[in-house]
């Protein structure tokens, strides 16, 4: 995940310039035919990274506006915010993030369609000093529905997220936010498939005009390869679709059963 976002308002200033690599270790299983659970442990590394040069070349090749990137050194790490609270992190490091647990009930689960309801709880196992945690327990509830055809699959999710506290933004992020996801997958034979996904979320921090802390919209484009009968390889990228509302670009690679 590579980001360079610089904003200044009358009472607030934000600079997010760095690269974050996250390894998510997840275990998912079924309790009964209708109930499933999932536990995820993230390992997060923040650094100056190495993708700034490649992103600059991408902008030049396609004639895109590089935004604030031209004014900042390459491969530096600065996470700075001044407002009700002050954040200034410039130290690289690898740390455990917030561990999450989720449980889902499947009202319907067949070859043609799926309907499920989920609830999640995130524990403050990360560090507020390294920005790998907000220092509070967080909850979320959402519904998921999917429809499958011979070569196409479409899925929709709608939910609410509620932090139970906030130690990063002095309580300003203790706000309920809504999120939504729409995904479409096209099978290309028995081995490969392509997927496009749109994720949106409402404001996550109150009392700010900073665009990066407001509503967000992200576009995911990726591919899935069936490696064995059980295992799948997923790869692709996530782009900030609304501009300056999320990390500039995120590349992902995952193995799932």
What are these regions (language model features)?
Residues 1-164, 169, 173-257:
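Transmembrane beta-barrel domains of Gram-negative outer membranes and organellar outer membranes
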């Amino acid at each position: 995940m590579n980001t360079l976002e610089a904003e200044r308002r009358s009472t607030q200033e934000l600079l997010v310039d760095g690269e974050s690599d996250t390894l998510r270790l997840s275990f998912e299983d079924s309790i009964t035919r209708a109930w499933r659970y999932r536990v995820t442990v993230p390992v997060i590394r923040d650094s100056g990274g190495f993708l700034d040069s490649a992103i600059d070349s991408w902008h030049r090749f396609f004639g895109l506006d590089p935004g604030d990137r031209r004014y900042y050194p390459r491969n530096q790490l600065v996470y700075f915010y001044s407002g009700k609270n002050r954040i200034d992190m410039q130290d690289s490091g690898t740390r455990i993030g917030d561990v999450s647990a989720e449980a889902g009930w499947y009202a319907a689960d067949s070859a043609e369609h799926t309907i499920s309801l989920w609830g999640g709880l995130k524990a403050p196992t990360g560090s507020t000093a390294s920005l790998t945690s907000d220092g509070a327990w967080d909850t979320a509830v959402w519904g998921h529905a999917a429809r499958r055809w011979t070569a196409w699959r479409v899925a929709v999710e709608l939910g609410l997220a509620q932090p139970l506290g906030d130690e990063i933004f002095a309580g300003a992020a203790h706000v309920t936010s809504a999120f939504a996801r729409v995904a479409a997958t096209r099978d290309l034979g028995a081995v490969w498939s392509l997927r496009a996904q749109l994720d949106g979320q409402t404001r996550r921090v109150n009392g700010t005009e900073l665009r990066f802390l407001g509503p967000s919209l992200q576009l995911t484009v990726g591919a899935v390869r069936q490696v064995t009968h059980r295992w799948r390889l997923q790869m692709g990228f996530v782009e900030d679709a609304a501009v300056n509302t999320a990390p500039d670009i995120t590349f992902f690679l995952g193995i799932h059963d």
